[in-house]
Amino acid sequence: MTSYSPINVKQLSQSSLPQKHKLQTFSIDVDKLLKRHYTPFLTWPSWFQRLVSWTLRLIIRQDTVNKFLSENSHLQSFDFIEKAFDELCFNYHFNAQDLENIPAKGGVIIFANHPLGALDGLSLLHLVSLVRRDVKIVANQLLSNITPLAPLLLPVDNLKGDSRKQDLVNIARALEADQAVIFFPAGEVSRLSPKGIQDKVWDAGFLRFSERLNLPMMPIYIKARNSGLFYSIARFSSTASMLLLPLEMIRYSGRFQFFTSPVITPEQLAPLSLSRKEKVKLLRKHLYQLPKNKPPVFTTKKSLIHPQSRQSLRLELKSAEKLGSTSDGKSIFLFTPHRDSVVLDELGRLREEAFRAVGEGTGHKKDTDLYDAYYRHIIVWDDDLLEIAGAYRLGEVWKWCKQDESCFVASQHHFHRPSQGLYSESLFKFRDGSENGITNNISEVMEAGLELGRSFVQPQFWGKRSLDYLWQGIGAYIARHPKVRYLFGPVSLSASLPARARDMLVWYYQNYYPESHFTAEPRAGFKLSTSAIAEMEKLMDGSNPQKDYANLRDQLSHMQMRVPTLYKQYSELCHYGGVSFSAFNVDS
């Protein structure tokens, strides 16, 4: 468990960007707030109004608060929050994992319980800002009176139980701009109930935004409580207890701790035959389970590790071998990993992100394995955006095979360096010799071979020729190493494909691109069923690859599918007969 004081947290935060603001003075006026937001106040005798106002000014220390606001009117956003924390001697607690669960980019809806009041919102804004600065919070009109916080707020009129259309439009625009937006679904501070201190009934607004914009939701539970006096008064008067909240904030000295969960996606909720109200109840239950170490309501994938420092990536890639440049100014590098490599961590993060985007992925924080450390990586780097656009992993088998003996002796490799063998060997067994009329020249292939695999293109670079640029890099590598004459490696079919689409693809590529140079035996082989084979033989010509490929594409399009990019590219890369799909393995 890690505890952060305001000073510790401030050191982690980035400095606020300088902005041009007209200096404003602002203050809290209890009398005006009562007249504006508590209608019965206007019906009271004037002497009683003055008495109530005077009493509340003392309780909330209005003069002290206004002095602080006046002295710090030059501060904005997160700087103002940190100054307020210093003034209140306030700190909060969280685990390192809690911070890792916050998505570092992309639109996300953060929903939380609301135990205290303003401190909940300020601390949540501050916590999220440690990961990303593009965060806003849906807040009531009272909080929006504090001018320095205005850039962080999306005001709604919770007190009247009604939100203007423009308020909702502003929230949607923030989310569509890939910002993080914080919601308190209860709309008011938690109350004492038979089950303890809990929120009142949640509004479903945050779920509506998630469904409409197809955005993930991240739960954050806040473990904190107000004083016994507050809950006692709240039983009789919600308005009176609300007026006590400033005093509760000033006097707060209890423990304040965050518990977070990885995001919950709209796809997880869509199959549930439940009303929106019932789904909100499940989300609420999931949130309240977080501090109890109980099984969560929703199974979540681990959040991706946060992006590596852009400058660290750039510096590390400067030492890599440059293979070339693209027509639009990107650089192509051949990267050799080393211990504690930030580039390798970023490759693992982006690889997992890319595979999750198509319904796959390991479910881990990053997709790396033991082979990444001694394989090399072709990387396309965008120096304008400081982003890795995509990568291919290379196993330099032609270097690793000993020159004085076969690469394969009794099915065992003899390598200079990698004791773990090849990545493809974890999925297939290779054999020398003759089988099914095929002379297997595995040793010849390996001695001049380059293993390819684990390729990806970062989603924001899809459709921007990034895969072509990776092949430009592979071509440049082969030009520098003319001994390489064979390319081989695994290529995957998504598990999310309909069974019929999968069967059609396997049949087509087995039929027209059979094994030719060597036999690969799958460790967990995939076999077409008799009925699937019968259907394919009826559907396909069987001897005309162009005609059957057109048929394959048409059949896949009816299922809203298409031929996987790498299958299409590999088969088009060589003249007919120059590429084979030797075997199909089921990856566990």
Model-derived features with residue positions:
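Membrane-anchoring hydrophobic helices of lipid-metabolizing enzymes
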Residues: T2-V108, H114, G121-S123, L130-R132, ...
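A short helix-loop-beta-strand connector motif used in the catalytic cores of GNAT acetyltransferases and
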Residues: L370-I379, K402-Q403, G577-G578, S588
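Glycine-rich, often proline-containing surface loops adjacent to acidic residues and nearby aromatics
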Residues: A104-I109, L149-P151, V181, F259, ...
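Conserved N-terminal entry element of GNAT/NAT acetyltransferase domains
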Residues: K301-H338
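Short amphipathic alpha-helix that is part of the acyltransferase structural core
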Residues: L323-H377, W381, E387-E396
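Non-catalytic C-terminal accessory region of glycerolipid acyltransferases
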Residues: V30, K165-S312, A534-G542
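Acyl-donor binding region in acyl/amide transferases
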Residues: E352, T362, W400-G577, S582-N585
